[in-house]
Amino acid sequence: IVRRGCCSDPRCAWRCG
């Protein structure tokens, strides 16, 4: 589960894709 704004964070954006 990814929180909103995680996609903007390079440390978490990889989980957004």
UniProtKB/Swiss-Prot annotation:
PTM summary: Not hydroxylated. Hydroxylation improves its folding but impairs its activity against target receptors. C-terminal amidation facilitates folding and correct disulfide pairing.
PROSITE patterns found in the cross-reference section: ALPHA_CONOTOXIN
Cystine bridges: C6-C12, C6-C16, C7-C12, C7-C16
Annotated site location: Important for binding to human alpha-7 nAChR: D9, P10, R11, A13, W14
Predominant subcellular localization, coarse grouping: secreted
Highest taxon above the source species: Eukaryota
Reported tissue expression: Expressed by the venom duct.
Propeptide segment residues: 1-4
Domain notes: The cysteine framework is I (CC-C-C). Alpha4/3 pattern.
Family: Belongs to the conotoxin A superfamily.
Other facts: This toxin is a substrate for a multienzyme complex that regulates its folding and assembly. This complex is composed of protein-disulfide isomerase (PDI), peptidyl-prolyl cis-trans isomerase (PPI) and immunoglobulin-binding protein (BiP). PDI catalyzes the oxidation and reduction of disulfide bonds. Oxidative folding rates are further increased in the presence of PPI with the maximum effect observed in the presence of both enzymes. In contrast, BiP is only observed to assist folding in the presence of microsomes, suggesting that additional cofactors are involved.
Protein name: Alpha-conotoxin ImI
